[in-house]
């Protein structure tokens, strides 16, 4: 994948963060930020301004949808991909209405997650690759 | 299930009967017969009194005289039915012989049976026993249904917990193992590779088991919701073929796709139908000898379209074909690469395909393999 931007990964489960971040590194993405909950995610987002956010739906205290709303308030153009396990159509529709770019099943094998992520990146960053030096 | 507790045998002793008659002698006769049988009896000498006694006594059965001063038997019965609805005890009318109209009106008013005066004790006892047994069976059945729905709810909740608390960690373990196998954290030694592949295979089969159990639970609970969208069968199949090639390559099995010039479009739930394609292809890989060729064919005709998966495996023995597509219908065939099987995959496929009004089937191809096919109606 020739995505040179940064990604912020938000999930309350450490093993998921470990898995997805290793996958991202394996795909050649080096700037990865992690947050274990919604409120830390918002703080971190303000500080590092990642190009893309991968956001878990099911989190205690502040769930993915609330976090998504808050992120969109900080930056309405931020690219957010929801991470779900069992795809719940209603939740996904709500997330898309709130401005999520896509959703990815985190229980899928690495190859499928990679492909879904690549599709999102292709469709969201058609014109200019973020973080890329202008040619 | 083989060991469900048997319902208790029917014991009618102590069941409560309300006898209503304005004739004291009749009441005494019938009371005598019934007490002798071990029933508990309450008496009322008018319709009005019957309504009062009913409320306090809560009988299991009512013997109701038709002709009474004040409100008659029919009116009393209608009032009882109206007040207590489904919970109302069965009512048997007591009527003088030869009054055929009474009998009809009695049934209309909600009675379950009638007894003709003068009483023949054996007939009274037999009929009352029949109705009390029926009523008790209905009650027991209601109780059982209530208990079963409770148990089913508990099962669903348990499986829901499995969904979240087992699936996520299992997918992480599987994903991490796969990434390590691809040298994502550095090159592994031969032994390390072997171990990481064992971890991968074990977590993969556990994940599959949990997923299949969950699918069955969801489908059985009637929660299979289809999010249909116009879908190209060829595209759907191609995706699955692409993803299955890696698994197949481990057994040096090739997957070939054959498609017609037509590109049939069907209305399906993509995720669910992909699951069917994945399952049929993965079965073909599982049961084919190493180094064989699996062919996936997309086909269509005037009003249906679908796909078929052919393999070079041993085929399904005729005497086991009835087990295909049934829950836990494991056959004698053994996966050729030591893969695991829950016996649920094809049952889930069948349920998904049927929910789409399609058909799924199987045929042996003349001793050289098996063919599974799915056919879906084309939108009109």
What are these regions (language model features)?
Chain A
Residues 48-54:
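Active-site beta3 strand of CheY-like receiver
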Residues 14-33:
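Two-component/phosphorelay signaling modules centered on CheY-like receiver
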Residues 53, 80, 103-104:
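Two-component signal transduction core modules
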Residues 37-40, 63-66:
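Acidic catalytic/metal-coordinating carboxylates
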Residues 59:
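Receiver (REC) domain active-site loop signature in two-component systems and cognate sites
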Residues 90, 108-121:
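C-terminal output helix
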Residues 66, 87-104, 108:
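Alpha4 helix (beta4-alpha4-beta5 surface) of REC/receiver domains from two-component response regulators
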């Amino acid at each position: 994948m020739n995505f040179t931007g940064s990604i912020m990964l938000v999930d309350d489960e450490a093993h998921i963060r470990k898995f997805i971040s290793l996958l991202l590194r394996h795909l050649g993405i080096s700037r990865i930020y992690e947050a274990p909950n919604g409120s830390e995610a918002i703080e971190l987002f303000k500080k590092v301004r990642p190009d893309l956010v991968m956001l878990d739906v099911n989190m205690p205290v502040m769930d993915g949808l609330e976090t998504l709303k808050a992120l969109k308030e900080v930056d309405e153009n931020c690219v957010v991909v929801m991470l779900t396990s069992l795809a719940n159509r209603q939740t996904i529709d709500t997330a898309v209405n709130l401005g999520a770019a896509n959703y990815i099943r985190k229980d899928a094998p690495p190859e499928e997650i990679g492909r879904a992520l690549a599709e999102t990146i292709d469709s969201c960053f058609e014109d200019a690759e973020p973080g890329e030096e202008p040619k | 299930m083989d060991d469900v507790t048997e319902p208790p045998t029917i014991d009618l002793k102590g069941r409560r009967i309300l006898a209503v008659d304005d004739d004291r002698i009749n009441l005494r006769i019938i009371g005598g017969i019934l007490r002798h049988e071990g029933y508990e009896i309450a008496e009322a000498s008018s319709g009005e009194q019957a309504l009062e006694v009913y409320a306090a006594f809560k009988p299991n059965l009512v013997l109701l005289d038709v002709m009474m001063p004040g409100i008659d038997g029919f009116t009393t019965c209608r009032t009882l039915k109206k007040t207590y609805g489904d919970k109302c005890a069965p009512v048997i009318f007591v009527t003088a012989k030869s009054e055929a109209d009474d009998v009809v009106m009695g049934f209309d008013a909600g009675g379950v049976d009638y007894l003709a005066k003068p009483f023949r004790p054996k007939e009274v006892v037999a009929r009352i026993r029949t109705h009390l047994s029926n009523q008790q069976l209905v009650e027991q059945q209601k109780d059982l249904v209530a208990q079963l729905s409770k148990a089913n709810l508990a099962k669903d909740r348990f499986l829901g917990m499995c969904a979240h608390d087992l699936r996520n960690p299992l997918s992480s373990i599987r994903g991490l193992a796969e990434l390590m196998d691809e040298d994502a954290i550095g090159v592994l030694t031969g032994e390390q590779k072997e171990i990481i592949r064992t971890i991968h295979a074990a977590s993969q089969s556990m994940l599959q088991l949990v997923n299949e159990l969950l699918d069955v639970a969801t489908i059985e609970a009637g929660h299979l919701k289809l999010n249909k969208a116009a879908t190209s069968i060829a595209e759907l199949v191609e995706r699955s073929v692409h993803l299955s090639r890696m698994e197949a390559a481990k057994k040096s099995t090739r997957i070939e796709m054959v498609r017609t010039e037509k590109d049939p479009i069907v209305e399906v739930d993509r995720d669910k139908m992909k699951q069917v394609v994945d399952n049929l292809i993965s079965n073909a890989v599982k049961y084919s000898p190493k180094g064989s060729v699996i062919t996936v064919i997309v086909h269509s005709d005037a009003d249906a379209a679908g796909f078929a998966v052919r393999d070079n495996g041993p085929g399904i023995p005729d005497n086991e074909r009835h087990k295909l597509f049934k829950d836990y219908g494991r056959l004698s065939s053994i996966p050729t690469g030591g893969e695991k099987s829950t016996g649920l995959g094809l049952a889930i496929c069948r349920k998904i395909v049927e929910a789409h009004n399609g058909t799924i089937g199987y045929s042996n191809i003349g001793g050289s393999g098996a063919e599974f096919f799915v056919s879906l109606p084309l939108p009109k």
